[in-house]
UniProtKB/Swiss-Prot annotation:
Keywords: Amino-acid biosynthesis, Aminotransferase, Cytoplasm, Pyridoxal phosphate, Pyridoxine biosynthesis, Serine biosynthesis, Transferase. InterPro entries: Aminotrans_V_dom (IPR000192), Pser_aminoTfrase (IPR022278), Pser_aminoTfrase_mycobac (IPR006272), PyrdxlP-dep_Trfase (IPR015424), PyrdxlP-dep_Trfase_major (IPR015421), PyrdxlP-dep_Trfase_small (IPR015422). Homodimer. It comes from Mycolicibacterium vanbaalenii (strain DSM 7251 / JCM 13017 / BCRC 16820 / KCTC 9966 / NRRL B-24157 / PYR-1) (Mycobacterium vanbaalenii). This is Putative phosphoserine aminotransferase.
Length: 371
């Protein structure tokens, strides 16, 4: 059986986790978690946990070099919850969405179901490509994903010409902390801990500009009904006190804080993005040279530094390759389930060693030769 193939130990990566979320958690984070037992089982309204939340917020402020007036806001529920929160609390009348994969389309879908706003404008591209950011005079929110996790397409964060007062709302779930960004080009840059920040899910974080904060206030003042769990005014009020509206998962916050400190200690966002650029360069160079593989994203300018997708020729069964890799401790290289392509998908977040990406490609070569 193919899955019984045993990859030589000297070819294997030091750490075989290449998932695109949840992603590799560094051992040092887990040690810090184990050493923080006195925080567990204590009130999130008291100083010890509030200081932990403050550590996360201050670290992100430093990591992204936030200008005065920008705030780090957080709440429970992950990016999925933030889509609904933004649909209620950031879209005033109408929005425009660039969709080019599963996750960029989901925010558009959430807005389309919101009874308080007009039908969104959808600008769509096929998986593996992306539309160019654009504006429309009828919209007050323009939204896209900095990194489309399902396909490995990255779209830069730049305010489109003619966007005026429209808020630029960026899904950075798998981008924040691993892709370059000028935060002043966005009004809401939202993400979750289980990608570049090597943590657990269940939490959303959003960097909001003064314009976004003002929009939240204006919509609330107009009396729009919003479920309290999805209320951005409530999230903002609590975040400014270094709290969440309802009880957070302490372990998630500890892992996140440790990863932020690690990124800052190594040189911040500049260091992190150089590291992911190195990892992705190794993956794409290998794919371009391999006789049986090619990068799924044809345009090099759109290829993600943090999520790499590699198509295989019909002569090679990528699912069989992934099965052998998994049996050998090299895990989570399977493609996004709904994409339905003969490919591997590789997470290359900052916690992943570039040398491990090179080792992964060597393992794939070894397996393909023997299938």
């Amino acid at each position: 059986m193919a899955e019984n193939l045993e990859i030589p130990a000297d070819l294997k990566p030091a750490d075989g986790r290449f998932g695109c979320g949840p992603s590799k958690v560094r051992p040092e984070q887990l040690k810090a978690l184990a050493a923080s037992g006195d925080l567990f089982g204590t009130s999130h309204r008291q100083a010890p946990v509030k200081n932990l939340v403050g550590r996360v917020r201050d670290g992100l402020r430093q990591l992204f070099a936030l200008p005065d007036g920008y705030e780090v806001i957080l709440g429970n529920g992950g990016s999925t919850a933030f889509w609904d929160a933004a649909a209620f609390g950031l879209v005033d009348k109408r929005s425009l969405h660039l969709t080019y994969g599963e996750f960029s389309a989901k925010f558009a879908s959430a807005v389309a179901k919101n009874p308080f706003v007009g039908d969104p404008i959808i600008v769509k591209a096929d998986a593996g490509s992306a539309p160019k950011p654009q504006s429309d005079p009828s919209v007050d929110v323009i939204a896209w994903a900095h990194n489309e996790t399902s396909t490995g397409v990255a779209v830069p964060v730049v305010r489109p010409d003619g966007s005026g007062d429209a808020l630029i709302v960026i899904d950075a779930t798998s981008a924040a902390g691993g892709l370059p960004v000028d935060i002043t080009e966005a009004d809401a840059y939202y993400f979750a801990p289980q990608k570049n920040f090597a943590g657990d899910g269940g939490l959303w974080l959003a960097i909001l500009s003064p314009a976004a904060l003002a929009r939240v206030d204006a919509i609330a003042a107009a009396g729009r009904w919003v479920p309290e769990f999805l209320s951005l005014p409530i999230a903002i009020e609590n975040s400014l006190k270094n709290q969440t509206y309802n009880t957070p998962a302490i372990a998630t916050l500890i892992l996140l804080a440790e990863q932020i400190d690690w990124l800052l200690g190594n040189g911040g966002l500049d260091w992190a993005t150089k590291r992911t650029a190195e990892s992705s360069s190794r993956l794409y160079s290998w794919a371009e040279a391999a006789s049986f593989a090619t990068p799924f994203v044809a345009d090099p300018a759109l290829r993600s530094q943090v999520v790499g997708t590699v198509d295989f020729s019909d002569s090679v069964d990528a699912a069989a390759v992934a099965k052998v890799l998994r049996a050998n401790g090299v895990v989570d290289t399977e493609p996004y389930r709904k994409l339905g392509r003969n490919q591997l998908r590789v997470g290359m977040f900052p916690a992943v060693e570039p040398d491990d990406v090179s080792a992964l490609t060597a393992c794939v070569d070894w397996v393909v030769e023997r299938l």
